[in-house]
């Protein structure tokens, strides 16, 4: 699960870089939303992993 969260974070970072950089100006809003969604998924996954180990 943590692996998928990291993969999605990388995808969101790439989408964010393209969206924020002006290359794909029309999709900047979507990239911002995806970035924060996958960042939240990463945090949730990290917390769930820490709880399982405890």
From Swiss-Prot:
**Transmembrane annotation, as ranges:** 5-25, 29-48
The record's InterPro entries line, in alphabetical order, gives: DUF1328 (IPR009760)
Q: Describe its membrane topology.
A: Multi-pass membrane protein
Among Pfam families, the record links this protein to: DUF1328 (PF07043)
Q: What is its main location?
A: membrane
Q: Which GO cellular component terms are attached? A: plasma membrane
The entry's keywords:
Cell membrane, Membrane, Transmembrane, Transmembrane helix
The places in or outside the cell where this protein is found are: Cell membrane
Q: Which family does it belong to?
A: Belongs to the UPF0391 family.
Its protein name is UPF0391 membrane protein Oant_1245
- The organism encoding this protein is Brucella anthropi (strain ATCC 49188 / DSM 6882 / CCUG 24695 / JCM 21032 / LMG 3331 / NBRC 15819 / NCTC 12168 / Alc 37)
